[in-house]
Amino acid sequence: MSQPIYKRILLKLSGEALQGEDGLGIDPAILDRMAVEIKELVEMGVEVSVVLGGGNLFRGAKLAKAGMNRVVGDHMGMLATVMNGLAMRDSLFRADVNAKLMSAFQLNGICDTYNWSEAIKMLREKRVVIFSAGTGNPFFTTDSTACLRGIEIEADVVLKATKVDGVYDCDPAKNPDAKLYKNLSYAEVIDKELKVMDLSAFTLARDHGMPIRVFNMGKPGALRQVVTGTEEGTTIC
């Protein structure tokens, strides 16, 4: 088996990645597959942390456009990420993976409150750490959370799992001739106005030299290939 090129990773999973074909809620089969793939990394000696979005359950920004207070909507979105985190932790437990769920704000009796040093300690003990509730502040996306937590825990890379094979020069769903980039610099992403993640998250990663790899989580084995250095997805650094 190929050896991992990363010792510690931050895996960013969108809420939509957890949906079934009906486009709603959480598909247990998808969660179980992800848990098995994460378990494979842990068995290879990789320290794994996870940030989950909440868009499969709730989108605060969308309701804000309909008149809801944005702060209230974002708080509801943060709670949606906690629900996804609970589901992911349960799937990992059932796969015999020791996992810890942390929230950016206190949720006594449900999960631990985020603590930087405790998170690193658990990662060193080969426990999967799931970060939920975003940054704990409104107006920040879960992509920003992924980059922030990745920098804080000194991850080697942020792995952004999507439904496409990487970063393209245009939308591959609309243009079958869209070009897939294998390698990009931070400057190229900004100059070409490529949609990798929101600008706040991306500039945070750039300013701290955090590499980003974008790949298709829907491809079985893609996560392992990324971690072992196979040319999979798009690398930004």
UniProtKB/Swiss-Prot annotation:
Q: What regulation of activity is recorded for this protein?
A: Allosterically activated by GTP. Inhibited by UTP.
| Reaction equation(s) it catalyzes | UMP + ATP = UDP + ADP
Provide the residue span(s) of the region labelled Involved in allosteric activation by GTP.
20-25
UniProt-listed SUPFAM superfamilies = Carbamate kinase-like
The principal localisation class reads cytoplasm
Q: How does it assemble?
A: Homohexamer.
GO cellular component terms listed in the entry, alphabetical order = cytosol
Q: Which InterPro entries match?
A: AceGlu_kinase-like_sf, Asp/Glu/Uridylate_kinase, Uridylate_kinase, Uridylate_kinase_bac
Q: Which UniProt keywords apply?
A: Allosteric enzyme, ATP-binding, Cytoplasm, Kinase, Nucleotide-binding, Pyrimidine biosynthesis, Transferase
Its annotated pathway reads: Pyrimidine metabolism; CTP biosynthesis via de novo pathway; UDP from UMP (UMPK route): step 1/1
Residues that, per the record, bind ATP: K12, L13, S14, G15, G55, R59, T162, Y168, D171
A biological process (GO) annotation for this entry?
A: UDP biosynthetic process
* Chain's role: Catalyzes the reversible phosphorylation of UMP to UDP.
Q: Where is the protein localized?
A: Cytoplasm
Q: What is the lineage of its organism?
A: Bacteria, Pseudomonadati, Pseudomonadota, Gammaproteobacteria, Pasteurellales
Q: Would I find Kinase among this entry's keywords?
A: yes
* Name of the protein: Uridylate kinase
Q: Which domain of life is it from?
A: Bacteria
